[in-house]
Design a protein with these regions (language model features):
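ATP-binding/phosphotransfer module of carbohydrate and carboxylate kinases, centering on a glycine-rich
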Residues: 1-66, 76-81, 99-107, 121-131, ...
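A charged helix-plus-loop insertion that forms the helical arch/lid used to bind
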Residues: 80-93
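A short acidic/small-residue loop/turn micro-motif
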Residues: 32-35, 90, 161-163
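Short beta-strand segments
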Residues: 8, 68-72, 112, 136-142, ...
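Glycine-rich phosphate-binding loop of actin/hexokinase-like ATP-binding domains
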Residues: 129-188
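Active-site nucleophile and cofactor-binding loops and adjacent substrate-binding regions
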Residues: 87-90, 110-116, 136-139, 285-291
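Short, acidic/small-residue loops that bind anionic groups at enzyme active sites
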Residues: 92-100, 165, 169
Length: 309
């Protein structure tokens, strides 16, 4: 059975795993990429972490079939290079991820956007198995997205497609986004948008955990904030349903475990907002793979791209 190195590069940490051809994670580790305030370039940290991980697992690089990388940012998947970001990640734009990993390990490498990989991981061994038309959305610091249409990942001309967070839902009167535009969906639908609104009401509501705990306790202010937040998420998703006509929408990110307070309201609101024919058969639920989705999806992207299965 073939084995692969899956790498998931985030803004604060890199996750690494040995993944087999059935999508099982056999071993994994995680290292900070921000440990020194990014004075060490992220790619340098990733290369060292990958070497240390394989050594710790006693896995020689030559025993692997290849390396699949999931990476935050706008990823030119054709070249395996970081084409852009919307945050402050020093020395990251232009990072030649594919070339440096191939040089270091003498293995074939593919690189794709992290939200695209999350969606592919779910299609391979998660909650989207057997589906051909899927929208995957991750809610966190921003909003990531991956789109599967007709069984194929929608990547666009350079592999940059699927930047759902920068779909402009408030283009005329919206707040400034880190990308330089106004009114991007993620400024209203990201978990950080909920936290910003909650902090204005009560400084103790500092993260998703404290906010949802207050909601579980029946706090009316928090429940109103959640209602407004899920409205924003649902309105963005409704527009995408009309464009892509998916069978399934998967919602990922740490908050996606909140079935009653998040997933159920979003599902009801999306179905109420779209035309009846689009709501028929539409499923909306939480993603299943959680923290492993990126590395698993990265390996699936590698297999689809390099092995043409």
């Amino acid at each position: 059975m073939k084995h692969y190195l899956g790498i998931d590069i985030g803004g604060t940490a890199v996750k690494l795993g040995i993944v087999d051809e059935a999508g099982r994670v056999l071993a994994k580790a995680e290292e900070s990429v921000s440990f020194d305030g990014y004075r060490t370039p992220i790619l340098t940290t990733v290369l060292k972490a990958a070497q240390a991980f394989l050594a710790a697992q006693s896995v020689p690089a030559e025993s692997l079939a290849g390396i699949g990388v999931s990476a935050t940012g706008q990823i030119d998947s054709r070249k395996g290079v970081v084409a852009g970001t919307c945050g402050n990640l020093p020395n990251y734009i232009g990072a030649p991820i594919k070339a440096e990993l191939e040089k270091t390990f003498c293995l074939p490498v593919t690189v794709a956007n992290d939200a695209n990989c999350m969606t592919l991981g779910e299609v391979w061994v998660g909650g989207a198995q057997g589906y051909t038309d899927v929208i995957g959305v991750t809610l966190g610091t921003g909003v990531g997205g991956g789109i599967l249409t007709g069984g194929r990942l929608l990547e666009g001309a350079r592999g940059l497609g699927g930047e759902l967070g920068h779909y402009r839902t408030h283009a005329l009167d919206g707040v400034d986004c880190t990308c330089g535009a106004k009114g991007c969906w993620e400024r209203y639908a990201a978990t950080t948008a909920l936290v910003r609104a909650a902090q204005e009401e009560n400084p103790a509501w500092k993260d998703g955990r404290t906010i949802f705990a207050a909601a579980e306790a029946g706090d009316k202010t928090v429940l109103a904030l959640l209602d407004a937040w899920t409205d924003e998420i649902a309105q963005g998703l409704a527009g995408m349903v009309h464009i892509f006509n998916p069978q399934l929408i998967l919602i990922g990110g740490g908050v996606s475990a909140q079935q009653k307070l998040l997933i159920d309201p979003i599902a009801a609101k999306v179905k109420a907002a779209v035309m009846p024919a689009f709501a028929e058969g539409l499923e909306i639920r939480a993603a299943q793979l959680h923290n492993d989705a990126g590395m698993v999806g990265a390996v699936y992207y590698f297999r689809q791209t390099m092995e043409k299965e």
